[in-house]
Regions:
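Carbohydrate transferase catalytic cores enriched for Leloir-type hexosyltransferases
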Residues: 1-625, 629-653, 658, 667-690, ...
């Protein structure tokens, strides 16, 4: 399971209280006992200092990358009614953020937060994809409404939190008493409330103080003789008044021997009130000691020094001070109610806290009987050893497992996908080229659309004059202008993206109307480059290049040839980031995304088989087709399909065929079904082909001619190098037609099952290719086996109906679970909040949503250039160093110079573009979007670095690094120093 611990209880007002201490101790124990599970922490970025201390506490237990922070609008304290809109917006933003982390279980350490601070804790009302667990400390305010809920604002806040708690899938009670309260008062099923108990920090243990240490301790806290001790806070239910009155009823000799020390923080009004009560009860001025706050170390020493610890509370969720005192070896007596008997574990150490006489009598029994005190000390140490944070954590994790198991079992009994209602199919805009456009994607769409229309009412969005496929005549057809005006009326939008000019118009449409992207070619650099002059988009390619690949790629393009840049860089990030979901047809495309944009970037992509139609049923018999094409019945025809170009390795096939036995068999022919690409490769290939009379090139092949050659072929060879992330439809067509096919394991072809083809190594040798040709040529049995296997594979996985159903599932899953769809739902839910809102609040909410987005891309090296770059006449060496950083950025990183302004850090784009000679791009110096894992790199002293980096960035997980700018920093040795700084 992925378990997320919401530890805001360790950040704000609860941080130094019992709840904060409990939450931290339990979370640390969970981290120690989470083997087999993935544990992550979620924190509130509004408290950056506490984030740093929590990161330090979990160092070595939880990877830094698994500690997340989120941002919400502030202020959000519910005590102020003016914060109502921000509170509700913040709860929605937090829930959305948590869902984006894909947890199985979220544990909220403390739900009753946020009354006067900016902690946001709630259990969403509906639509949870994960289980929520909440720690249940007690329900004392509900049980004692007259004391705690008299203020209407407090009551409204508390009851709202109760309703949220009741929605939780699991409550982790800190005692058996608290568990029973949850079951009875919240009317919850027993299986939803689990007692995990509590424990104390190992620092609470017996210690021996030297006489002078003891004397100094007592003197510092105003204690002058042996003492009776209480700690645990000043509150009505703590019953300190009853304790003072009970102490006053002790025999005079005991009061003269023992002071009463109340050890805890105390406000002046409470101090004056308790001192008046003591005087009224007849106590001398020094009988009662109100110490005020004491450190943990002094608290432990006081526990060890006290003659008796008394815990007279009227109600507790657990009673941690009593356990701490026992763990230190103090004799402990306490109330006989709620959870306190569980903690103390001894019936004769209990008293009725509502009876002053009972409290006093119990105290006197211990103080007058040393043997009784010794027995309580020994029993207390034994009892305290029964409580363990590791055991608490193990119980909690077991409860998580059981709760998650129930959800998983429920999921297995439901249908994963609900078919679209026959009454109304969703309306889908389909943006793609279609026949007669000479594009493989056009044919692909024509094949897919009839089956996809079983699931959607489809309308075609075209950038062509007409469609000549009769099967598509019933689909409504519109141009881009119509779509711009009517896109909002569609339920779904699908874009078929490829790397040709037929897709150039889609970039603007996608920017204006986001939708599902089917990425046929991972590299889109070709179409983007050609779109600049054809669609009047100046610098479109360079802007896309920078946004996808950074200044290094931009500098390369400036210094070299555009063609080399187009070949080197995919340039597709704008399309991918704007898509509401992405479908690809090979895992190779996913691997490319991970290579270029980070290991998690394509986590939500769907890999679907490429739709291919079965062999056409009206094909005449094979001998007749071969005769029509000019071949004899016993000829052996080897075909290769597609445009002839360098990446298709056609020249290597020609050479291998000429060197093989096939070239010497007059029955054998090699046919390239396609046209030769222009350029030097094409010229050389024509000369090579001309050297043998039985090597043919058809030129552009119509659909009918293409299918005829598929029907006629005895074997096929489809090779590839320098894949651009595309999937070869020709390979699949060959298999579908039962043509034994040779491929090399490059790109998507590596995913064709080995039993269905002859698969050479990616970097195959000429001998291997020649051997494969001769093996197929000489073994009709092998050809027959491969023919059957290939056709069976295609029928099972690539049929039109099967692919259309997978399309439907992918589109609907994206609409249901995809990040863009979830963000749109979040925005809609925020817009529906029924509370007064101001424009600054809306801006805060928008900024929070943007900041909370997952990074999932290349990491940034944020170079602070204020030290030198913004000063006129900066030294050329300094500019050279920055240029070297840009060009030598380690793999997986991009260098982004940044600068400060009055509000924070901005990207120094104008400066950097001028530096690399591309000032014409005129990109905006936008606010820096710092993400976890980024590095802030300052060139200068540690002092400047410490001042410069925003604390929120540190909290977010941005690493702070300094690179000394000295004479040793030269461009030629920079990369090693840069790598060292990133470690």
């Amino acid at each position: 399971m992925r378990i997320i611990l919401d530890l805001q209880a360790c950040q704000a007002s609860s941080m130094h209280r019992g709840i904060g201490r409990y939450s931290m101790a339990l979370a640390l124990a969970m981290a120690r006992n989470s083997a087999g599970h993935e544990l992550r922490l979620v924190l509130n970025e509004d408290y950056p200092d506490s984030v740093a201390s929590i990161r330090q506490a979990f160092d070595g237990l939880v990877p830094a990358s698994h500690i997340h922070t989120f941002v919400t609008p502030v202020p959000a304290g519910e005590v102020d009614a003016r914060n109502a809109w921000r509170v509700h917006a913040a709860e929605r933003i937090r829930a959305h953020y948590l869902a984006g982390l894909r947890p199985d279980v979220v544990h909220i350490a403390s739900l009753f937060e946020g009354l006067g601070d900016n902690v946001i804790a709630s259990v969403p009302a509906t639509g949870n994809s994960f289980d929520t667990a909440v720690t249940l400390y007690d329900l004392i305010p509900l049980m004692r409404k007259e004391r705690y809920l008299g203020d209407p604002n407090m009551a409204a806040w508390y009851y709202r939190k109760l309703e949220s708690m009741k929605r939780a899938d699991l409550l982790l009670a800190i005692s058996g008493s608290a568990r029973q309260e949850g079951i009875d008062l919240l009317q919850l099923p027993p299986e939803r409330v689990v007692n995990i108990s509590s424990a104390v920090d190992p620092i609470f243990r017996p210690r021996v103080l030297a006489p002078d240490e003891r004397a100094d301790l007592l003197a510092r806290h105003g204690v002058k003789r042996d003492f009776i001790m209480y700690t645990g806070g000043i509150d009505y239910r703590k019953n300190i008044e009853g304790l003072i009155e009970a102490y006053a009823k002790l025999p005079p000799q005991l009061r003269h021997q023992y002071q009463l020390a109340v050890v805890c923080s105390i406000r002046d009004p409470d101090r004056f009130r308790l001192e008046r009560l003591a005087a009224k009860s007849g106590l001398a001025k020094d009988d009662l000691v109100l110490t005020g706050y004491v450190s943990d170390d002094d608290l432990i020493s006081l526990y060890n020094c006290t003659a008796l610890f008394v815990f007279p509370s009227l109600h507790e969720g657990f009673g941690l001070p009593a356990l701490e005192a026992m763990a230190c070896g103090a004799p402990v007596i306490g109330s006989n109610n709620s959870s306190i008997p569980e903690v103390i574990g001894r019936a004769d150490a209990m008293f009725d806290p509502t009876s002053v006489d009972a409290i006093s009598a119990s105290m006197a029994q211990v103080l007058l009987d040393p043997a009784r005190g010794t027995a309580l000390r020994e029993q207390g140490l034994a009892q305290a050893s029964c409580f363990s944070w590791d055991v608490c954590a193990q119980r909690a994790i077991e409860a998580f497992e059981e709760t998650h198991g129930r959800r998983s079992a429920a999921k297995r009994t439901t249908v994963a996908f609900a078919p679209v209602s026959s009454e109304r199919k969703p309306r889908l805009a389909y943006v793609s080229p279609l026949p007669p456009v000479r594009s493989g994607i056009a044919g692909y769409s024509a094949d897919l659309l009839p089956a996809l229309s079983q699931h959607y009412d489809i309308e075609l969005i075209l950038a062509q004059d007409s469609v000549d496929d009769p099967a598509l005549g019933t689909f409504p057809q519109h141009d881009s202008a119509w779509f711009d005006a009517n896109a909002h009326t569609f339920d779904r939008i699908v874009y078929q993206f490829g790397n040709s000019a037929f897709h150039a118009h889609m970039f603007g449409l996608l920017e204006r109307h986001p939708g599902m992207v089917v990425l046929h070619d991972f590299y889109l650099s070709g179409v983007i480059s050609h779109a600049e002059p054809d669609h009047h988009l100046p610098n479109h390619y360079c802007r896309s290049l920078y946004l996808a690949h950074g200044y290094g790629a931009l500098a390369e393009e400036k210094q070299g040839e555009r063609a080399a840049s187009v070949m080197a860089y995919p340039c597709n990030k704008q399309v991918l980031d704007r898509a509401t979901g992405v479908i690809v047809h090979s895992h190779h495309a996913v691997d490319l995304a991970r290579h270029w944009y980070g290991p998690d970037y394509a986590a939500s992509w769907r890999v679907l088989p490429l739709v291919r139609l079965p062999p056409r049923t009206d094909t005449a018999d094979r001998a007749q087709v071969r005769a029509q094409l000019g071949f004899a019945a016993d000829d052996v025809i080897t075909c290769s399909f597609g445009i002839l170009s360098a990446p298709k390795c056609n020249d290597r096939l020609v050479k291998a065929w000429i060197d093989s036995a096939l070239a010497h068999d007059p029955r054998c022919h090699l046919v390239f079904v396609g046209e030769i690409a222009p350029g030097r490769f094409g010229i050389a290939l024509r000369d090579l082909i001309a050297s043998h009379p039985r090597i043919h090139v058809t030129g552009y092949a119509s659909t009918t001619q293409y299918q005829d050659y598929l029907a006629a072929a005895d074997m096929a060879v489809q090779l590839r190098a320098n894949s651009r992330g595309e999937t070869s439809g020709a390979v699949l067509d060959c298999l579908s037609y039962g043509v034994p096919t040779i491929v090399n394991a490059h790109g998507a072809a590596a995913e064709v099952p080995a039993h269905a083809c002859v698969r050479l190594d990616d970097a195959f040798t000429q001998d291997a290719l020649r051997g494969a040709l001769e093996a197929l040529h000489g073994d009709p049995v092998l050809r027959a086996r491969l023919s059957r296997a290939g056709a069976a594979y295609m029928q099972a996985t690539h049929s039109r109906e099967h692919c259309a159903a997978l399309y439907r599932d992918a589109i609907e899953a994206c609409m249901r679970d995809g990040a863009p769809a979830a963000e749109q739902a979040l925005i809609a839910s925020i817009a529906a909040i029924d509370a007064k809102v101001a424009d600054p609040d809306l801006l805060q909410a928008a900024a929070a949503i943007a900041t909370n987005r997952a990074c999932g891309s290349t990491r940034q090296i944020l170079v602070d250039i204020d030290a030198f770059a913004l000063v006129d006449g900066a030294a050329q060496r300094e500019r050279d160093v920055l240029m070297a950083m840009i060009s030598q950025a380690p793999e997986g990183w991009r260098v982004e110079p940044v600068r400060r302004d009055g509000t924070g850090y901005r990207y120094a784009r104008r400066y950097t573009l001028d530096l690399i000679g591309r000032a014409d791009l005129q990109l905006e110096d936008a606010v820096v979007d710092a993400k976890p894992g980024d590095v802030f790199l300052s060139l200068g002293s540690d002092t400047a670095r410490a001042i410069a980096i925003p604390p929120r960035w540190i909290a977010r997980g941005v690493q702070d690094r300094c690179l000394a700018f000295d004479g040793a920093m030269m461009p030629m040795n920079l990369k090693e120093r840069l790598l060292a700084a990133l470690v």
